[in-house]
C-alpha cells in the first residue's frame, strides 16, 4: 500500500509535465537544456524573493490576519513575471515555443523543490493521507498557472501589441500575480476545507487560463 500510494502520487504529479513536454513539441526542438536553464533562473528568483521577504516582511505572529502585510508579500510575485520574461528573452523561436520552455522549466523546478521531498517522505508513510493526492493535483494547477503567466508576459512584451489589447493583458497579469493572495484570503474568511480550497483554485485558474487563451488567439490572429 505504501509504494502503491507513492506511485499514484508521483504519477499524478509528474506525468502531466512529461506529457506536456512530449505533446507540445519541445522534445523535437531539443529544448531540454533550455528548460533546465529556466529552472535555474527559477531558483535564483526564489532566492531573491526569500531574501527580500525575510528582510522587509518578517513572519507575522499576531492572531489577526494581516491583510496589508499579506498583500505586500504577494506583490513580490511580480519577480516571477520578470524571471519568465528573462527566460523568454534568451530563447529564439516562435512565441509558443518561448512560452512553453519558460513555463515548463519554471513549473518543473517548483515541483522538484517544493513537492518532491514531501511526496517521497510523506506518501511512503504507513498511513494513507489525502493531502499528498491534493499536493499532486495542485502541482498540475501550478503548471497551468505558469503557462498562463508566460503567455501574458509574452503578449505584454510584444513591441507591436495593439494598444486596445494592453489593458486586458495588464488586468490578467494583475490577477495572475495576486491570485494566490485572493484565494488565501477567501479560504481564510470562508474557512474552506482543503478539498474546497483546491477546487476553488482549480476553477479560478481555469477561468484565468481560458481568458488568457482567448486573448492570446486574438493577438496572434491580429498580428498574423
From Swiss-Prot:
The chain crosses the membrane at residues 1-21, 35-58, 67-88, 99-124, 130-155, 165-187, 195-216. Keywords: Cell membrane, Disease variant, Endoplasmic reticulum, Intellectual disability, Membrane, Nucleus, Transmembrane, Transmembrane helix. Its main location: endoplasmic reticulum. It is a multi-pass membrane protein. The keyword Transmembrane applies. One of its GO terms (molecular function) is ribosome binding. The keyword Transmembrane applies. GO terms for biological process: multi-pass transmembrane protein insertion into ER membrane; protein localization to nuclear inner membrane. Pfam families: DUF2053 (PF09767). It is found in: Endoplasmic reticulum membrane; Nucleus membrane; Cell membrane. Residues 59-66, 125-129, 188-194 are lumenal. GO terms for cellular component: endoplasmic reticulum membrane; multi-pass translocon complex; nuclear membrane; plasma membrane; protein-containing complex. Residues 22-34, 89-98, 156-164, 217-224 are cytoplasmic. InterPro entries: TMEM147. Component of the multi-pass translocon (MPT) complex that mediates insertion of multi-pass membrane proteins into the lipid bilayer of membranes. The MPT complex takes over after the SEC61 complex: following membrane insertion of the first few transmembrane segments of proteins by the SEC61 complex, the MPT complex occludes the lateral gate of the SEC61 complex to promote insertion of subsequent transmembrane regions. Also acts as a negative regulator of CHRM3 function, most likely by interfering with its trafficking to the cell membrane. It is linked to Neurodevelopmental disorder with facial dysmorphism, absent language, and pseudo-Pelger-Huet anomaly: An autosomal recessive disorder with onset in infancy and characterized by global developmental delay, intellectual disability, dysmorphic facial features, coarse facies, and behavioral problems. Affected individuals may have variable findings on brain imaging, such as cortical atrophy, thin corpus callosum and enlarged ventricles. Laboratory studies show nuclear lobulation defects in a subset of neutrophils, indicating a pseudo-Pelger-Huet anomaly. Belongs to the TMEM147 family. PANTHER family: BOS COMPLEX SUBUNIT TMEM147, SMALL SEVEN TRANSMEMBRANE DOMAIN-CONTAINING PROTEIN. Component of the back of Sec61 (BOS) complex, composed of NCLN/Nicalin, NOMO (NOMO1, NOMO2 or NOMO3) and TMEM147. The BOS complex is part of the multi-pass translocon (MPT) complex, composed of three subcomplexes, the GEL complex (composed of RAB5IF/OPTI and TMCO1), the BOS complex (composed of NCLN/Nicalin, NOMO and TMEM147) and the PAT complex (composed of WDR83OS/Asterix and CCDC47). The MPT complex associates with the SEC61 complex. Interacts with CHRM3, CHRM1 and AVPR2. Interacts with LBR; promoting LBR localization to the nucleus inner membrane. Interacts with DHCR7. This is BOS complex subunit TMEM147.
Amino acid at each position: 500500500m505504501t509504494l502503491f500510494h507513492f506511485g499514484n502520487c508521483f504519477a499524478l504529479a509528474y506525468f502531466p509535465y512529461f506529457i506536456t513536454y512530449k505533446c507540445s513539441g519541445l522534445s523535437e526542438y531539443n529544448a531540454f537544456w533550455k528548460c533546465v536553464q529556466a529552472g535555474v533562473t527559477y531558483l535564483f528568483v526564489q532566492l531573491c524573493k526569500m531574501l527580500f521577504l525575510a528582510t522587509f516582511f518578517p513572519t507575522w505572529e499576531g492572531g489577526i490576519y494581516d491583510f496589508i502585510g499579506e498583500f505586500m508579500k504577494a506583490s513580490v510575485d511580480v519577480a516571477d513575471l520578470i524571471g519568465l520574461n528573462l527566460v523568454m528573452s534568451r530563447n529564439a523561436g516562435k512565441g509558443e515555443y518561448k512560452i512553453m520552455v519558460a513555463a515548463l522549466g519554471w513549473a518543473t523546478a517548483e515541483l522538484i523543490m517544493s513537492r518532491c521531498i514531501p511526496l517521497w517522505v510523506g506518501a511512503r508513510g504507513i498511513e494513507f493521507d489525502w493531502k499528498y493526492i491534493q499536493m499532486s493535483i495542485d502541482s498540475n494547477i501550478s503548471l497551468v498557472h505558469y503557462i498562463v503567466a508566460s503567455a501574458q508576459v509574452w503578449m505584454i512584451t510584444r513591441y507591436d501589441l495593439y494598444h486596445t489589447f494592453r489593458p486586458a493583458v495588464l488586468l490578467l497579469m494583475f490577477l495572475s500575480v495576486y491570485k494566490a493572495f485572493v484565494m488565501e484570503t477567501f479560504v481564510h474568511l470562508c474557512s474552506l476545507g482543503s478539498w474546497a480550497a483546491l477546487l476553488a483554485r482549480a476553477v479560478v485558474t481555469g477561468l484565468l487560463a481560458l481568458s488568457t487563451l482567448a486573448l492570446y488567439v486574438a493577438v496572434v490572429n491580429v498580428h498574423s
